[in-house]
């Protein structure tokens, strides 16, 4: 069984489409990735949706994103080969799991994708976790364990818009995995570049701007006093907490150069990760780094400087899975678990109060054939042993 994962994150830079072959365990199931950048007008609309947005505008954006995802899915199949289902993360518009009531919202018209492709779509993963009392994020850590668990404990860091870290116990270690959001990944740096360039640039390519500046350690400590960094896991965050309004406020009182501002924001991401790892995990000798932040040389160096006891490795080069593929692959795997009726126990990850089957299934034209295939599917577990985070229904 082959799944296509579609992922667009809080950076809102585009869609990653990756194929996972579930017949092969772990990283060996990776079959390729295709990335489609959002058109500038759509990206602007997505970013604007983080502010007040009317029902009609939200509904129209939902359909426009669905049309974009459908085009990406068709092109991914053309490039990477046929698949049996699509797993859609969608575009996060709001993430406030600690509200009254808490909620998270991802949009992207899954029905449009199913109709356009004829394929069954699994979607809406995060709201199931929130319904079970969880944060709705991070959801990728079980896939980290499926792919990257080793004899010794290991850390896996994803540097997308937000930064989230997973601590994996060594094989045979009875301790459960731990995972949580550390705070901002690329989101504040990207916002600062956009602000300082008057919209002419959207990211600090290779960390060159930050590398040309000096970190303001006084401001850094002020920013690290943010309440989120003091909060114990399980915890998750989003643009509502770390986004353009925060960067605009900090920039308005900044007296140094733009390069120094970028250098200090880069240090903020690195130091917040390092402090979170020391405070809330048992630590590990190595950490695999994925996501767009892994391509930022200034950020990778800042991480290594802040975590001298841990070897910081580029996850894509170390594992053979490109950084832009990891989250899309994870959702393809999560989609397979939903189709197979597998419960995920995420108590030590999101704080969910009991195991749940994550996701909703929207049958496509291939649904009857997929049902037959699912009835013949062996259980998909991690490597040779039982996967501790899975429980059969």
UniProtKB/Swiss-Prot annotation:
Q: Which Pfam families match?
A: AnmK (PF03702)
Q: Which residues bind ATP?
A: 9-16
Gene Ontology biological process: 1,6-anhydro-N-acetyl-beta-muramic acid catabolic process; amino sugar metabolic process; peptidoglycan turnover
SUPFAM superfamilies noted in UniProt: Actin-like ATPase domain
InterPro entries found in the cross-reference section: Anhydro_N_Ac-Mur_kinase, ATPase_NBD
Q: Which keywords belong to this entry?
A: ATP-binding, Carbohydrate metabolism, Kinase, Nucleotide-binding, Transferase
> Looking at the keywords, is Plastid present?
no
User: Pathway involvement?
Assistant: Amino-sugar metabolism; 1,6-anhydro-N-acetylmuramate degradation; Cell wall biogenesis; peptidoglycan recycling
Q: Which reaction does it catalyse?
A: 1,6-anhydro-N-acetyl-beta-muramate + ATP + H2O = N-acetyl-D-muramate 6-phosphate + ADP + H(+)
> What Enzyme Commission number(s) does the record list for this chain?
2.7.1.170
Q: Which domain of life is it from?
A: Bacteria
Any one GO MF annotation of this record = ATP binding
Job of this protein = Catalyzes the specific phosphorylation of 1,6-anhydro-N-acetylmuramic acid (anhMurNAc) with the simultaneous cleavage of the 1,6-anhydro ring, generating MurNAc-6-P. Is required for the utilization of anhMurNAc either imported from the medium or derived from its own cell wall murein, and thus plays a role in cell wall recycling.
- What family is it from? Belongs to the anhydro-N-acetylmuramic acid kinase family.
Which named protein is this? Answer: Anhydro-N-acetylmuramic acid kinase
Q: Which gene encodes it?
A: anmK
């Amino acid at each position: 069984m082959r799944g296509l994962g579609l992922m667009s994150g809080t950076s809102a830079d585009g869609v990653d489409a990756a194929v996972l072959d579930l017949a092969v365990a772990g990283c060996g199931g990776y079959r390729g990735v295709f990335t489609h950048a959002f058109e500038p007008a759509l990206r602007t609309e997505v970013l604007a949706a983080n502010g007040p947005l009317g029902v009609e505008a939200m509904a129209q954006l939902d359909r426009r994103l669905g049309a974009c995802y459908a085009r990406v899915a068709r092109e991914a199949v053309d490039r990477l080969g046929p698949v049996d289902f699509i797993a859609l993360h969608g575009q996060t518009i709001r993430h406030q799991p600690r509200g009254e009531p808490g909620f998270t919202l991802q949009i992207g018209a899954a029905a449009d994708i199913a109709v356009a492709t004829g394929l069954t779509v699994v979607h809406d993963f995060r709201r199931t976790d929130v319904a079970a009392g969880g944060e709705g994020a991070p959801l990728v850590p079980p896939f980290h364990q499926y792919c990257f668990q080793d004899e010794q404990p290991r850390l896996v860091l994803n540097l997308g818009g937000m930064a989230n870290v997973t601590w994996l116990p060594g094989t045979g270690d009875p301790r459960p995995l731990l995972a949580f959001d550390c705070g901002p990944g690329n989101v504040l740096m990207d916002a600062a570049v956009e602000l300082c360039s008057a919209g002419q640039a959207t990211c600090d390519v290779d960390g060159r701007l930050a590398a040309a500046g000096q970190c303001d350690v006084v401001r850094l400590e002020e920013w690290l006093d943010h309440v989120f960094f003091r909060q114990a896991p399980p915890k998750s965050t989003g643009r509502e907490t770390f986004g353009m309004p925060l960067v605009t406020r900090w920039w308005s009182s900044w007296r140094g150069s733009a390069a120094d501002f970028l250098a200090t924001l880069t240090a903020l991401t690195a130091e917040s990760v390092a402090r979170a790892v020391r405070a809330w995990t048992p630590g590990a000798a190595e950490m695999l780094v994925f996501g767009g932040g892994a391509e930022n040389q200034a950020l990778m160096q800042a991480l290594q400087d802040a975590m001298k006891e841990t070897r910081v490795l580029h996850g894509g080069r170390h594992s053979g899975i490109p950084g832009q593929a990891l989250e899309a692959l994870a959702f393809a795997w999560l989609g397979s678990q939903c189709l197979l009726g597998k419960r995920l126990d995420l108590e030590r990850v999101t704080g969910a109060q009991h195991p749940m089957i994550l996701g909703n299934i929207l049958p496509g034209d291939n649904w009857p054939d997929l049902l037959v295939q699912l009835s013949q599917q062996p259980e998909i577990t991690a490597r040779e042993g039982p996967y501790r985070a899975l429980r059969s229904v």
